[in-house]
Design a protein with these regions (language model features):
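Autoinhibitory propeptides
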Residues: 1-115, 121-138, 436, 476-480, ...
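Short acidic, glycine-rich surface-loop motifs adjacent to enzyme active sites
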Residues: 71-72, 238, 267-295, 318-319, ...
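Subtilisin-like serine protease catalytic core
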Residues: 103-259, 361-362, 373-374, 484-486, ...
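Extracellular S/T/G-rich loop segment that most often corresponds to the catalytic His/Ser-adjacent loop
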Residues: 143-152, 156, 161, 165-176, ...
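Hydrolase catalytic cores
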Residues: 210-213, 221-222, 234-242, 271-281, ...
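Catalytic cores of secreted or luminal carbohydrate-active enzymes
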Residues: 282-283, 300-340, 601-609
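Noncatalytic modules at the cell exterior or secretory-pathway interfaces
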Residues: 361-364, 430-446
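Edge beta-strands of jelly-roll/beta-sandwich modules across compartments, strongly enriched
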Residues: 423, 447-460
Length: 613
């Protein structure tokens, strides 16, 4: 059954759904008639992979969109190349964040006894930056979801798990060290580390995050240093999203994209190390999406919050790179919303969104969210002037529009009441959009006074060429799942001049909860964690995911003080967040909390200073 299930989980012929109710509610007593696999995430949430030929209609929009997996992209700037740059490590961001100050003999916070956990593109485990002084690995395990030839972790159905013992054996083989400690070149010419542990990080993003948060200290910190350089490491290399999901979300070729189903299973696996090793675990998520409600109402966000709320778990999530992308629109219908002088309600007020589409865009999605009892209707005007009258889509159905003079096809789907939040969603899927300015009119058929709606376009990584609102709103531009309530959500700033990173995602959440929580450095960071070879090569990188890694490293230092050293053994993400808020650096001329900085800049040293007051 496990092998059979493995094929279903990885095959593009099986469509995945995220369920937050028992499987029996779908199949009843007829489950045996269906070709499917089911993975239990927790007591409420499960993942169904079902043969697409057994669905009544394989057009995805005919099914419940809210059960589709989210698709997430990496929150970095640029891709790593094979070029070796060999720059000099700059400790300034660590000092600015109060990280190196607590590594001294008085507190000696180095991440000792803490597990740093990552779900990302993998790790270059052969790099010296992830080894102890004796050459052994600091990695407790790697679950590579992309390798199907080995055994998956216990209780999981796909991928291959590599233990610390296997990784050490691979490293010893590559260095020519035999089991008895002698060294030779004979007998190892045809055996490499990758023959034993064939897990690599082709992208480099995951390797950089781990190195930044917990890479080994070199040269007593002068050659390289990280916040939690003595923490243990667990990594999940996520498998790429299935092709049907990429096609549905219209992800460009060559762009990394991952399904929330695999991220949830990764987090479940990483969480198990807290139980097995009885140690605190710090999770770092450096990816996100613009889809979903920007409130944490979906099953994915709810699951992450359930993990973040456990004792000895600390969840850190990036706020994303969408703050300056012009991908968010906020509209508000005027007070009265179409009422005439006599109070009649014949015509609803319409708010027009203008979306610019560049040449070379094959397609994109746009989501429009509002609160009940607003009943959204949309009109469409093409760049060529063709017009579709305001139409209210029926509950969980879709309308498909074609045009006379333009080749664009638009499908409009309505979830009148969505799962989780209960809010209303209109999803618009553009195929082969005509370049130019599209005008989308939005009105409320129920004419709720002073009603508001929000619309989002995909993250920049998921667009071939620019697509953006001409009158955007920069707020509420953090990527999902940054809105998870108990997680520590990071804004990104430049620690060299204390300015906010221009692309840093902004809050608050759509329901006005305070997010982001704390800003961390993420601009021009020198990181030793190249994806190739054994020797660390220091290079400079920028991006919101790096701010999350810096915060995760600091959280691991704090977890050592709290849990390992016994000062607050039952601590959770929310309490760690509050400690960090108390110690955050704040400017006198700025009001806090705010949508850009949250509660201020990370200052781990000042967190402990505040405890003494």
């Amino acid at each position: 059954m496990a092998q059979d299930c493995r094929e279903k989980i990885i095959s593009n012929n099986y469509i995945d759904f995220v369920l937050d109710f028992p499987l029996e509610e779908i199949f009843g007593d007829e489950g045996g008639r269906y070709d499917y696999c089911y993975q239990q995430v927790d007591s409420r949430i499960g993942i169904l992979s079902i043969n697409r030929n057994q669905l009544p209609d394989t057009s995805l929009l005919s099914n419940d969109y809210m059960s589709f997996p989210d698709i997430l992209g990496l929150q970095q700037v640029g891709e790593e190349t094979n070029e070796v740059r060999g720059e000099v490590f700059n400790p300034s961001p660590l000092i600015q964040s109060g990280i190196t100050q607590v590594q001294d003999a008085r507190l000696n916070l180095t991440g000792r006894g803490v597990i740093l956990a990552f779900a990302d593109t993998g790790i270059n485990y052969r790099n010296r930056i992830f080894r102890n002084a004796d050459g052994s690995t600091r990695i407790l395990a790697i679950w590579d979801q992309t390798v199907q030839e080995g055994e998956p972790p216990e209780g999981f159905l796909y991928g291959t798990e590599y233990t610390k013992e296997e990784i050490d054996r691979a490293l010893q083989t590559e260095s020519g060290i035999i089991g008895n400690g002698s060294t030779t070149t004979a007998g190892i010419q045809n055996v490499r580390a990758l023959d034993i542990v064939p897990s690599i990080d082709e992208n480099g993003h995951g390797t950089r995050l781990v190195s930044l948060a917990g890479g080994s200290r070199l040269g007593e910190g002068s050659v390289y240093n990280s916040p939690a350089f003595q923490a243990d490491i667990v990594v999940v290399k996520l498998k790429p999203a299935k092709e049907y999901l990429r096609e549905y979300y219209q992800i460009p070729d060559g762009v990394s994209a991952y399904s929330s189903t695999d991220v949830m299973m990764a987090v479940k696996y990483l969480d198990s190390f807290a139980k097995v090793f009885r140690r605190p675990v710090v999770f770092c998520l450096g990816m996100g999406t613009n889809f979903r409600d920007h409130e944490s109402g979906g099953a994915f966000s709810r699951y992450l919050n359930s993990i973040a709320s456990k004792r000895s778990r600390i969840m850190v999530i990036t706020g994303g790179n969408e703050g300056n992308a012009s991908h968010h629109y906020r509209g508000r219908f005027p007070e009265g919303n179409g009422r005439g002088e006599n109070g009649d309600r014949n015509v609803a007020s319409e708010e027009s969104m203008e979306v610019y589409v560049s040449e070379g865009v094959d397609g994109f999605l746009m989501e429009v969210w509002t609160e009940a009892p607003v009943n959204l209707a949309v009109s469409i005007r093409t760049p060529g002037g063709e017009y579709i009258d305001p139409t209210s889509v029926l509950f969980q159905t879709n309308l498909r529009y074609r045009f006379v003079f333009e080749e664009t096809v638009i499908t409009v789907y309505n979830a009148y009441i969505t799962q989780g939040s209960g809010d209303a969603l209109v999803l618009m899927r553009f195929e082969n959009p005509t370049p130019g300015i599209w005008t989308i009119g939005v009105s409320d058929e129920n004419r709720v006074a002073d009603a508001r709606f929000d619309a989002w376009l995909p993250i920049s990584e998921f667009l071939q060429q620019p697509v953006y609102f001409l009158r955007p709103n920069p707020d509420t531009t953090m990527t999902t799942p940054a809105y998870v309530p108990d997680a520590i959500t990071t804004a990104t700033y430049n620690s060299f001049d204390n300015s906010i990173y221009q692309e840093s995602g902004r809050g608050f959440s759509r329901d006005e909860r305070i997010k982001p929580d704390i800003a961390a450095p993420g601009v021009d960071l020198t990181i030793a964690g190249n994806r190739l070879g054994e020797e660390p090569v220091i290079s400079t990188y920028t991006g919101a995911s790096l701010a999350a890694a810096m915060m995760a490293g600091a959280a691991a230092q704090f977890a050592q003080w709290a849990v390992v050293d016994g000062n607050a053994p039952y601590i959770r993400s929310q309490e760690v967040k509050n400690y960090f808020i108390r110690g955050a650096s704040r400017d006198r001329n700025i009001d806090y909390p705010n949508e850009i900085w949250g509660w201020g800049r990370l200052d781990l040293y000042n967190t402990f200073v505040e405890m003494e007051r």
